[in-house]
Amino acid sequence: MTNIRKTHPLMKIINDAFVDLPTPSNISSWWNFGSLLGLCLIMQILTGLFLAMHYTPDTTTAFSSITHICRDVNYGWIIRYLHANGASMFFICLYAHMGRGLYYGSHAFRETWNIGVILLFTVMATAFVGYVLPWGQMSFWGATVITNLLSAIPYIGTTLVEWVWGGFSVDKATLTRFFAFHFILPFIILALAIVHLIFLHETGSNNPTGIPSNMDNIPFHPYYTIKDMLGALLLILTLLMLTLFAPDLLGDPDNYTPANPLSTPTHIKPEWYFLFAYAILRSIPNKLGGVLALLLSILILAFIPMLHTSKQRSMMFRPFSQFLFWVLVADLLTLTWIGGQPVEHPYMIVGQFASILYFLLILVLMPVASLIENKLMKW
């Protein structure tokens, strides 16, 4: 008798994706982040669902409904902070996952990579609209500043901004629609993640060497299920440490002040995971130029497969490319730091230099380094 997991129409799909999936025998812990992202998404949907039961998307009551959740709802405070810090963990896993893909040449799987880029945009949109919901000072002004960027679009800009706002300023209509978007987008992310997996399972996983592993594959279960469990344990432990010991470490104190359209905070800045893009936006003294640079800083990922000039897939055996990759990581960390600083003399010039270096590395230096490595290998 054949096992039910191999014959049942539904269980067969799960079996082929998580049990009998042929997996390279040499993938490292950098391959854990995919499953961790799935775990983060499930946690965010669940905590978000319970928060939505008590939240009111109305300008007069939104802020106090968050206070009510934290003070009066049973374990409301932990649900709220798990959700807020869960977003940070989500982005840590997301950036690690993307970095791994870039380093080991996973962008050779074009479809999987492109769905991944779309997923990144969707997750960023979800996080942005979600940050507006507590209706604190930073929520309100962050929404005002970022949505206002649309006005840089020639001819239709102003109309577009007012259309997004649902009025002449960020108000009740904006908050209500942002709540609607924040509720629906995670389910779109879930659907896209399934498509991402479908495309990945068409080709099979990459591995650190970048060499096809078809002759040495092992079943996903039990080998990688147990390995993913360790990653999940570490993720949950980190999230709980953050939530229980320093829940406001990554938040902004300004968001504990109710939104006031009449008083602007001294430094308007987004959450830490958007600071690198915010620094790129601010480093260009022209509105439209800044918006284009902001968009390109993320969209550039879609062009990575076309910019791959090396004859080797992975960076494992390419020291020049490795060096430039870590320079890129350092550059992004610098941009993240700059994004959180005021627009003053030393920070501005450092931000501009780091922004130029970011595009230079991806568009010029890394492809050229790959060509030099090809020559050295006599390929």
UniProtKB/Swiss-Prot annotation:
Heme b b566 binds at H97, H196. Gene3D superfamilies: Cytochrome Bc1 Complex, Chain C. Heme b b562 binds at H83, H182. GO terms for cellular component: mitochondrial inner membrane; respiratory chain complex III. One of its GO terms (biological process) is mitochondrial electron transport, ubiquinol to cytochrome c. The keyword Electron transport applies. The chain crosses the membrane at residues 33-53, 77-98, 113-133, 178-198, 226-246, 288-308, 320-340, 347-367. Its main location: mitochondrion. Binds 2 heme b groups non-covalently. Coiled coil: none annotated. It is a multi-pass membrane protein. InterPro entries: Cyt_b/b6_C, Cyt_b/b6_C_sf, Cyt_b/b6_N, Cytb/b6-like_sf, Cytochrome_b, Cytochrome_b_C_euk/bac, Cytochrome_b_N_euk/bac, Di-haem_cyt_TM. It holds the Pfam family Cytochrom_B_C. Heme 1 (or BL or b562) is low-potential and absorbs at about 562 nm, and heme 2 (or BH or b566) is high-potential and absorbs at about 566 nm. The cytochrome bc1 complex contains 11 subunits: 3 respiratory subunits (MT-CYB, CYC1 and UQCRFS1), 2 core proteins (UQCRC1 and UQCRC2) and 6 low-molecular weight proteins (UQCRH/QCR6, UQCRB/QCR7, UQCRQ/QCR8, UQCR10/QCR9, UQCR11/QCR10 and a cleavage product of UQCRFS1). This cytochrome bc1 complex then forms a dimer. Belongs to the cytochrome b family. This is Cytochrome b. It comes from Eschrichtius robustus (California gray whale). The lineage of its organism: Eukaryota, Metazoa, Chordata, Craniata, Vertebrata.
